[in-house]
Amino acid sequence: AMISDTQRWYNSTEDVVKALNARGDIDFVIHGGDQSDFGVTKEFIWMRDIFNKFQMPYVCLLGNHDCLGTGEDAYRAIYGDPNFAFTAGNVRFICLNTNAMEYDYSEPVPDFNFIENELNNLSPEIEKTVFAMHVKPFEFVFNNNVAKIFQLYVNQFPKVQFCLYGHEHKFAVDDLFNDGVLYFQCPCIDKRIYLLFTIKEDGTYD
């Protein structure tokens, strides 16, 4: 399942945790970023305490609002590096910081070294890939000088199923590069919507 942009909507976030727990068929949850609005440490702690009520594993991406003030420090203290990856079954999930506008080029965003390291060290058991990020390519917060290069890297991974993102607070599905890789946008939690995906052995998904 995916949720995103929960900033300041604590009651709706509590509700989605209860709803996903009640389903009984969720393997894990990806939060698409912006759990804080102002990068205040207490915002991260309040949200973390809500997320810890999930009865399944969850991960949180770094959003652009999470970068404000000392927000990234709080994020790193609670969740770790904003570029990370994990494996579920034979699917590699690659989660990236794409909030380039929040940086002064002191850090590579997106981090192609991280992406290339993932590509070069994939287990032979990995058959499919999913990318998750807060901001999609061609949105102004993304470093659009490298948008097409980013997608070239994406397409080198085995059987990319789709890409996930948040940020714009609405639902959308787009083939951004006209290459068959769909980008799914998860709305903000105030819309009381989550996305649910089932990845099948035959390479299809619902």
Give residue spans per PLM region:
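Acidic-and-aromatic substrate-binding clefts and catalytic sites of carbohydrate-active enzymes
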Residues: 6-11, 35-42, 67-72, 104-106, ...
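Hydrophobic alpha-helical
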Residues: 139-151
